[in-house]
């Protein structure tokens, strides 16, 4: 099986573009590829899914233990003909000023070769020096080959012998610049895949260009690895509860692994749209409001008053509810849109969502629960991630958040039927799915007893 990591010296080098082009080309060649993303990013896996038509999965060595990451990789890679892991940021850049949770640490943990994506603009010999530095920064860099991005054929033919001589690494090919295939960006990075109407056409152009300019035989020889050791499938529970999951253009940041863990714990997931549907699905015993871009759809969310009222009444009535980041903002009193206009929201929580215009409390952190609640025990610790340009006038105080070994802030609302806060939680390898489903089961029993 071909297995490798796509990495680059820095952000903005075109990793996602190259990854999507490679996935499409591999699929075209009948390789049945699957994809992973290093780190907590939600958007890149959406692009992978658009190419493959199957789920892409996150592997994060800050949010998860190494054994959990290895098990997730083996589980989701099983049965595929090729595995492509897209790195995040620069190759060695991880949490803070360390390599923790970097693309390099993932390659090292999984013992995978790395294809280094390099943009050659404005450099030649210096490019070789930079690559040498990356190769020798760690005793085992895992860098196996080089791919030039945004590169002309003429420049490729000039640089290939130079780079191979100076670095000892094969230059496997190049992806030329295609102005007609550029994907625009937005405040969380790239636009989501569902918002780009001509995405399939753009990726098709990129795949054709890469397929024509890549040394496939060498790539296969460098990246062929034994299939990951199989892991026993998780034992499926039969809790018999339905959990409603918000899923639309406003709420699109849910880890596929989280949803799978909820199913394994016994939940039947029922998807709905707070933008378009008028009420919650029937006979639900739990509600999951993930993150996304509610600030960009504040008006239609607000104008859907029947849905806002249904969610407010359900949450206030004790329906077990988890609301992360954008879902947390939706439960507030009002939410400002991009122009600063405040729109009424569900009104469950006291805070108002406000536009800040910069990243707020960005990055990895550690969160400690102050009291027992739906998802947590008092004193329990969980690794989290935050990434948002909006804030709330009341972020709650149910948790202490640690960053760089210091208490930085308090956040979150927690009760025996609620978790709501800005932090994104990674559920795989934790007791959270089981506890959420257990809370839903308890709610179901209470509801039946009331009706009896």
What role is predicted for each listed range?
Residues 294-372:
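Cysteine-nucleophile active-site neighborhood
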